Every structure is written in structure tokens, then in C-alpha cells.
Amino acid sequence: MEMDLPSAIANAQKEHFHADWFLKCIHWLLSLAILVIFSSIGSVYSLINSYNRRSLIIQTISFVYSIIDSIWGYRDYFGHENKMCHGTGIFLIFFYLTVLIIGFYNSKINNSNKVISVTYKVLSCLIVLCGVIRLSAGVVSMLEFCYDDHTGQCNAHGIMGMSFIVYGVLLSVVLVVPWLRVNKGKYSQEMYDSTVIMVWGVINTFTEHRPWEPWSHGDYQHTSMGIIFWAAGLLGMFLSINRKRNFMPALTMILTGYAMSGHVQELIISTKVHAFFGYVLMFGGLARIVEISFLLDDKDESIDGEIRSFQYLTPFALILSGILFMGANEEQMQLVVNLGADHSSYILTITSAAMILQLWILALLRFYLKLTETSKTNNSAYDDINTLDHSDGQSQFELDNFSV
């Protein structure tokens, strides 16, 4: 029996749907490899002056790919280009171009201008963050999320979740890099943390509720979170005077986790994911208090001089909670329900992603320390040779502009 015309059209559309989905997945994975993984290696190279040339090569390759990526773009199943992907793609092209211009100029002047050198390093690290945003836009386009009324809610989850991840990354850097782990600055770590928390709280207090609309249950929840943030931040700043360590940033994590653990959602699975997010955040705050109170001496080093495995818990908890919160938006929770999965399966998958991300961050930090050690060794060897006497009275090596 021959298939009728409507059925044939439906089957053709279904085959096109699967082929289009396969190509989008390949495109996304390729973007992950080049715009995030490859670019993050280039960012590490950029932090050491003697490896700037390698970082520029990697950034040039990524820049060329970003142009191709923007031209290709992500297209949803209705045939029109997703505006967010197009916008982030164009922004990434100009951002890469800016970094390359500054990087080539910095290389030309041999890192002699500290402002240019520091600017290049900072922008090189921000490239990775831009790549992550680009990939997030790809997911939004592939799954057709965050359109219309869902846009604000997705943005809130994305921004807040990314903030937790960035905080976890910063704590990992401070923990692993020795010259940052030993606090010799004017202020303690908690002074910086409390200041950011205070500013964030002020912004949330006055932006979570529209004055011309009646107060809702969600408005009370989000505004109260903003109030506790700036109140805790101010107290933390006061307790940080004279480079004192204190518990307020960690206590803020615990209070935030407590509030989110009881944040009831429309879907049961969403309520459970939010609850687990809260538990993880509370655990991370408790681990931070234990670390500051019992594992660090007066010089902010571990008592035995080594990093204990317990100290990795807080950065990991922040990264995990950030990914959980980013993945707890309304439409993503509905997708999990439609797939027939439960909250435990989804949480385990998210936790696996957080572990891989933490692994990659720690690997990059170890790579940075190794490059720094190698660069210093090479410089020391060159300096020793440069001081040797030669029969012609001339030095065989010119290293006046060479710096780590």
C-alpha cells in the first residue's frame, strides 16, 4: 500500500529534523573544543610573557573559527536565525580582534608597558568566558529555550549560576597558586568577597521588583536575598579590617543555600533540584568556615604547608551549585520531565559535568605553574650564560628585554 502524501511529508520532515540536530551537535562540540578548551590553553600561555607568541597563535586560530562559526550560526527548526546566537557571534569576533591587536602590540614592545601587558592578560582570560556564553547561546538555540516570557527567567538563572562558577574558579586559583594563596596584600580574601557580595546585594534589592507592579511571592524571596547580601557584605567588610579572616562570605553561602532549599517551584522536579542546589551551597559554606577556622595558620597557609583535599570542597561546591542553578530554569526542567527522567538522574549528570569542569580548571592551574617554573629555569640558565666571559669580550646573548 502506498504511503499518502501527508505521511510522506511528515517522515521527510522528521528525517530532516534528526539530520539537522546531528549537525548542530557536531557544531556545538567543535565550538566547545576551539572556543573554550583550546582558547583556555591560549589564555594560560598569555599569562607568562615568554609564551605570548604561542597564545597569539592559538587566539588567531580561534578568531578565524569564530568568523566561520558566526557565518554558519545556529538556526532553529522554524528556519529563522536565533538572535542571541547571532549577537554573541558578532561580539566574539570583535572581542577576539581587539585582543589580537593588543596582543600583537604587546609582543612588539616586548611587554615593556605594564598597562598593555596586564590588559592583554585580562582580556585573554575573558575570551574563555565569552566562549562559554557563546556555547550557552548554542544550547538555547538548539533546544529552542528562553523565548518570549521565558527570556528573563533564563537570564536570571544564567547570570546567577555563572557568578557562582566564577567565584569557585577564583577560589581555586587562590588555593592552588602559591603566591596568591599566601595573603601578602593589604586586604584579606574576605574583604574582596564581602565587597562583591555587598554590591551584588544592593543591585538585587532594587532590581528584583518593579515598583509599578504589586508585590508577589517571588519578589519577596528575591528582594530579601538582596537585602541579606548587602547586610552580610557590610559586616564582612568591617570584620576584614587589618587583614582579618572572617566567616561572613561563607555564612552568606549557607543562608543563600537555606533560602533556595525551600524555594518551591511549579514542577516537583524543579523544587527538588533547587533544594539540592541549596544543600550543596550550605555544604560549601560550612566547609569554608572549617577551612578558615581550623586549617589555616596566621599566614593563611595550611598548618602543614600543603593543600589538603578538604580545601577543594568549597570551590567544587560553588561550581556544582552554579551549574545546577543554570540548569534549573523552567523550560529545562520541563524537558527533563518530557524525557521521562527523574531529579536524581538529572542531578547526577549535572554533578558529573561539574567534576569534569573542576578537573579542567585544576589541570590548567597545574599547567600554568609548570610553565612558570620552566620559564624561570630557562631565564636563570640564560642569565648564567650571559654573565660568562668570552674571548671577543662580547656577550653571545642579548636578554635585556626578556622577562617572565
Language model feature labels by segment:
Residues 1-18, 133-137, 325-336, 342:
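Extracellular/lumenal N-termini and interhelical loops of multi-pass eukaryotic membrane proteins
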Residues 1-75, 95-96:
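N-terminal signal-anchor module of multipass membrane proteins
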Residues 42-48, 101-109, 172-179, 234-244, ...:
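Transmembrane-helix exit/juxtamembrane "anchor" motif
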Residues 112-115, 126-129, 195, 253-255, ...:
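Non-transmembrane, juxtamembrane loop and terminal tail segments
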Residues 131, 135-304:
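Generic multipass alpha-helical transmembrane bundles of integral membrane proteins
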Residues 287-294, 301-376:
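C-terminal transmembrane module of eukaryotic multi-pass membrane proteins
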